């Protein structure tokens, strides 16, 4: 069987990648045809074909976030590569090993006005350094790049392919799945001393990890952080900021002496106030090159701890009381009919329906904050969310990538493990094209996407933009109502659709998806005009 030099190079590129990968996302194109045919001839790779490079890159991101190993997205030259920038940006800031493998014209065509030709070298800048492969002797650069901390960042592999691109015969099937060679590499910032006899609070966010020495310390944990042994509700931060409270003649200090930040917490303004309070000693623990210190006053930075002393019982009681006050306040406010059916009610229903072994993907903006307020993280439930740059784009594709990665872990099970995604309506519509899955492609077998549809940007109701004095221009600039018929949208893409107008409707629909798995979208029709008052009431419960 004859092959072209371009096909020979493509084969060597995929061969260099194959020890590190299990999945490939492939986009149609001419210049990348040698890479496409080579990938489809490999029996050791799961291939997912998508026609939109932007969606494809986010699908690869969703897969890679769960697998914690590289997932390449392969495309042709030109703007096809540019469309990967949003996913690359999230991957870079979330330290996810996304690989963009782009086909390119040979060097002699760059700058000549040749069709579909741009300078693709370093197109992503420092976010994803370019590895140029223009000849077989360059292929070794791929292994070198993957060995130099690719686990901490995305990479761009730019493969220059000259004509003729492909021979008239298909390559033979080959490749045998073996163990994937990929080791997560972390940055070690050293060890820090921690005196637990002081009033200490841990704040854990995305990219946090379990630290045995701090297990007994009261912890505000975001949904994507490990489950805390001694959890503190995030709204309790407002209570802890009081400094002192008095009752029955006693004065109790509520402000912590020492805060330990683990990972990358970003969700709640009250928590941010604690982190940036210059009167509170701050230690930041990180295993990446990102140090989460928004107030720029960290006293110490490390990756490991050496502890002395024990937590004071009085401090533990204060944190428990503050957390209980916040959690009870959430339940009381949600029970009030005057607030209607909001996104927070949707999050509560989703949380209540989760079981051990379920996986959650949550879009940025209100949904992830709402899940945090209603109690996540839960034991036995993994939560994934784009917290690197916290954008809503690519959410549908990432949710699908999450579900596909989870079901690939259990190929022999009759029923794939359940994945539940919570998205706002703008996040869903923004990436509606992610619903397009070809008839020959792997499909999620047990994915439920819940869309909290308040017909616009509900988060802006809670921010300064929602102030009464700005209402006359709020809807057009921030509310951005769209009136999209989500039922018709799902029908166009062949996705099962359900509608929930009330909390009870939603609970029933979620229960049905447990009994009858598949790929389903549930639209929860909510209101947003009460969100500002609801949030104000929640905050008042702990102030």
From Swiss-Prot:
Recorded metabolic or biological pathway in which this protein acts: Quinol/quinone metabolism; 1,4-dihydroxy-2-naphthoate biosynthesis; 1,4-dihydroxy-2-naphthoate from chorismate: step 2/7; Quinol/quinone metabolism; menaquinone biosynthesis
Enzyme category, top tier: transferase
GO molecular function: 2-succinyl-5-enolpyruvyl-6-hydroxy-3-cyclohexene-1-carboxylic-acid synthase activity; magnesium ion binding; manganese ion binding; thiamine pyrophosphate binding
Essential cofactor(s): Mg(2+); Mn(2+); thiamine diphosphate
Family annotation (Pfam families): TPP_enzyme_C, TPP_enzyme_N
Enzyme Commission numbers on file: 2.2.1.9
InterPro entries: MenaQ_synth_MenD (IPR004433), THDP-binding (IPR029061), Thiamin_PyroP_enz_TPP-bd_dom (IPR012001), TPP_enzyme_TPP-bd (IPR011766)
Entries under Gene3D superfamilies matching the protein: 3.40.50.970, TPP-binding domain
Biological processes per GO annotation: menaquinone biosynthetic process
Top-level lineage group: Bacteria
Reactions it catalyzes: isochorismate + 2-oxoglutarate + H(+) = 5-enolpyruvoyl-6-hydroxy-2-succinyl-cyclohex-3-ene-1-carboxylate + CO2
Alphabetized UniProt keyword annotations: Magnesium, Manganese, Menaquinone biosynthesis, Metal-binding, Thiamine pyrophosphate, Transferase
Cofactor note: Binds 1 thiamine pyrophosphate per subunit.
Family of the protein in this entry: Belongs to the TPP enzyme family. MenD subfamily.
PANTHER family: 2-SUCCINYL-5-ENOLPYRUVYL-6-HYDROXY-3-CYCLOHEXENE-1-CARBOXYLATE SYNTHASE, PROTEIN PHYLLO, CHLOROPLASTIC
Role description: Catalyzes the thiamine diphosphate-dependent decarboxylation of 2-oxoglutarate and the subsequent addition of the resulting succinic semialdehyde-thiamine pyrophosphate anion to isochorismate to yield 2-succinyl-5-enolpyruvyl-6-hydroxy-3-cyclohexene-1-carboxylate (SEPHCHC).
Assembly, per entry: Homodimer.
UniProt name for this protein: 2-succinyl-5-enolpyruvyl-6-hydroxy-3-cyclohexene-1-carboxylate synthase
Species per Swiss-Prot/TrEMBL record: Corynebacterium efficiens (strain DSM 44549 / YS-314 / AJ 12310 / JCM 11189 / NBRC 100395)
Gene: menD
């Amino acid at each position: 069987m004859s092959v072209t030099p371009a096909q020979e190079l493509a084969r060597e590129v995929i061969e260099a990648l194959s020890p590190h990968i299990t999945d490939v996302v492939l986009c149609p194109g001419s210049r990348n045809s040698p890479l496409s045919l080579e990938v489809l001839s490999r029996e050791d790779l799961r291939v997912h074909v998508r026609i939109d490079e932007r969606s494809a890159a986010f699908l690869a991101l969703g897969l890679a976030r769960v697998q914690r190993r590289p997932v390449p997205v392969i495309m042709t030259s030109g703007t096809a590569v540019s469309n990967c920038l949003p996913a690359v940006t999230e991957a870079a800031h979330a330290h996810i090993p996304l690989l963009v493998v782009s086909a390119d014209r040979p060097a002699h065509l760059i700058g000549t006005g040749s069709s579909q030709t741009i300078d693709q070298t370093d197109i992503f800048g420092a976010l994803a350094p370019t590895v140029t492969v223009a000849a077989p002797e360059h292929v070794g650069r791929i292994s070198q790049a993957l060995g130099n901390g690719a686990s901490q960042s995305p990479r761009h592999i730019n493969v220059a392919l000259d004509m003729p691109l492909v021979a008239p015969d298909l390559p033979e099937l080959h490749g045998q799945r073996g163990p994937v060679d990929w080791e997560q590499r972390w940055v070690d910032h050293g060890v820090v001393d921690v005196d637990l006899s002081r009033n200490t609070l841990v704040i854990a966010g995305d990219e946090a990890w379990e630290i045995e020495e701090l297990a007994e310390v009261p912890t505000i944990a975001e949904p994507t952080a490990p489950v805390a042994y001694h959890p503190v509700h995030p709204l309790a931060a407002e209570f802890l900021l009081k400094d002192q409270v008095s009752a029955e003649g006693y004065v109790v200090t509520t402000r912590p002496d020492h805060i330990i930040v683990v990972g990358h917490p970003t969700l709640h303004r009250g928590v941010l106030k604690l982190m940036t309070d210059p009167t509170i000693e701050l230690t930041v623990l990180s295993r990446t090159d990102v140090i989460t210190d928004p107030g720029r006053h960290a006293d110490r930075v490390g990756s490991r701890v050496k502890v002395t002393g024990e937590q004071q019982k009085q401090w533990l009681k204060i944190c428990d009381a503050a957390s209980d006050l916040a959690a009870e306040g959430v339940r009381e406010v949600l029970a009030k009919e005057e607030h209607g059916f909001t996104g927070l009610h949707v999050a509560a229903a989703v949380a209540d329906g989760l079981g051990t072994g379920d996986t959650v993907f949550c879009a940025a903006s209100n949904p992830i904050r709402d899940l945090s307020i209603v109690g996540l993280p839960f034991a036995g439930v993994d939560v994934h969310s784009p917290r690197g740059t916290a954008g809503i784009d690519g959410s549908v594709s990432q949710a699908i990538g999450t579900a596909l990665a989870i079901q690939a872990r259990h190929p022999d099970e009759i029923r794939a493990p359940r994945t539940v995604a919570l998205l706002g309506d703008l996040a869903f519509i923004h990436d509606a094209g992610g619903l397009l899955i070809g008839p020959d492609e792997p499909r999620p077998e047990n994915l439920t996407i819940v869309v909290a549809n308040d017909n616009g940007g509900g988060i802006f109701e809670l921010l300064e933009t929602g102030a009464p004095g700005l209402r006359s221009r709020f809807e057009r600039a921030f509310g951005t109502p769209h009136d999209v018929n989500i039922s018709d949208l799902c029908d166009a893409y062949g996705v099962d659709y359900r509608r929930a107008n009330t909390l009870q409707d939603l609970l029933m629909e979620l229960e049905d998806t447990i009994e009858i798995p598949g790929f389903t979208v549930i639209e929860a029709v909510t209101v947003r005009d009460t969100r500002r008052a609801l949030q104000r009431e929640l905050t008042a419960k702990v102030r």
